[in-house]
């Protein structure tokens, strides 16, 4: 018995990454999955390029997966936002691995964009929903390994793979994100409040959160199925996991399941808009702190002091993330 998994991918002006991700997914060994590709009103040629890829007119260059024409053309079902209410997901009538393309009328952002996909995915009554970033490439057995572990314990609510950097100075075996712990009482900045494990142990890890870049939810069992759209820039996944953990569900990182993620390098290196990004992190982390610590006001003096120090450090060009 292979429970059905609905995989949700969010695209915004990123068709090259998206078709590489799709190519890796259409070569996995797990037999029972569907892909819901949510386009957040891209302004480039994303939809046209994805059409070309599905038709076999556009190949994929990747160091992790070899392009094949054997599974082309790929059948897809495409819907504009005004037709979302008409979408039906009947796995019994059509058990093949299907691709749904949803075209949003505007850019709803990460949380709400994924929530649109989740809402539609739930119509098919899947056992699992997988949130997967479009700039990832998956190993062919990653989903089989995630499902095996998730099915092994009824208390598991969320599982995730080990995430490696797509390219770290030419290396592909450098862990970017495994899982982590959250200490609400410490400095509430993204890089300090959240402890990220960078060591891959043989045993799976019971943790506080796994990354929303690759997060599989046991949606038939868990009471919380959507991301908090009041948060943004990296905390939606942590918020969901913490809420489920508080309800008694386990959050498990499956160390034998692997994917590669491009975003980790860009976040690590930062950009010319670094101060703006840091201020966004400060804002959302304060919201997160308010949600998860009723005595958050006791930490505000320290919070304000450390915000000032953080701003000074960024202004003089020092690197923020802890290694």
Where would I find each of the regions flagged by the language model?
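N-proximal low-complexity "stem/linker" segments adjacent to membrane-targeting elements
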Residues: 1-27, 83-87, 91-94
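Short, acidic, metal-binding catalytic loop of nucleotide-sugar glycosyltransferases
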Residues: 23-32, 53-57
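Acidic donor-binding/catalytic loop of UDP-sugar-dependent glycosyltransferases
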Residues: 45, 136-149
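Acidic/His-rich active-site region of diverse nucleotide-sugar glycosyltransferases
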Residues: 95, 103, 112-115, 145-226, ...
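Active-site nucleotide-sugar/metal-binding loop of Leloir-type enzymes
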Residues: 111-128
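Short beta-strand-to-loop acidic/aromatic patch adjacent to the donor-nucleotide binding site
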Residues: 125-137
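Active-site-adjacent helix/loop segment of glycosyltransferases
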Residues: 164, 245-321
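Catalytic donor-sugar/metal-binding loop of nucleotide-sugar-dependent glycosyltransferases
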Residues: 223-224, 229-232, 238-260
């Amino acid at each position: 018995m292979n429970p059905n998994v609905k995989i949700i991918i969010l695209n915004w002006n990123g068709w090259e990454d998206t078709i590489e991700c799709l190519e890796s997914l259409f070569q996995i060994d797990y037999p029972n999955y569907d892909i819901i590709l949510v386009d957040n009103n891209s302004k480039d040629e994303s939809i046209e390029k994805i059409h070309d890829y599905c038709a076999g007119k556009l190949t994929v260059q990747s160091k992790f997966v070899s392009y094949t024409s054997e599974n082309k053309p790929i059948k897809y079902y495409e819907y504009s936002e005004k037709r979302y209410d008409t979408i039906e997901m009947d796995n019994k009538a059509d058990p093949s691995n299907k691709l749904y393309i949803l075209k949003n009328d505007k850019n709803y952002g990460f949380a709400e964009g994924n929530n649109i996909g989740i809402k539609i995915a739930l119509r098919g009554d899947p056992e699992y929903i997988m949130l997967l970033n479009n700039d990832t490439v998956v190993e062919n057995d990653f989903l089989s390994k995630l499902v095996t572990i998730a099915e092994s314990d009824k208390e598991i609510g969320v599982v995730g793979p080990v995430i490696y950097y797509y390219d770290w100075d030419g290396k592909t075996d450098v862990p970017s994100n495994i899982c982590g712990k959250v200490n609400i009482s410490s400095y509430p900045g993204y890089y300090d409040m959240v402890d990220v494990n960078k060591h891959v142990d043989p045993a799976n890890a019971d943790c506080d959160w796994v990354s929303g870049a690759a997060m599989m939810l046991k949606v038939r069992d868990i009471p919380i199925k959507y991301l908090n759209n009041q948060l943004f820039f990296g905390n939606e996944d942590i918020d969901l996991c913490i809420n489920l953990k508080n309800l008694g569900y386990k959050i498990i990182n499956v160390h034998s399941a692997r994917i590669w993620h491009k975003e980790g390098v860009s976040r690590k290196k930062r950009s010319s808009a670094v101060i703006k990004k840091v201020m966004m992190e400060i804002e959302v982390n304060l919201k997160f702190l308010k949600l998860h610590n009723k005595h958050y006001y006791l930490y505000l003096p320290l919070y304000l002091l450390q915000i000032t120090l953080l701003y000074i450090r960024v202004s003089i060009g020092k690197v923020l993330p802890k290694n």
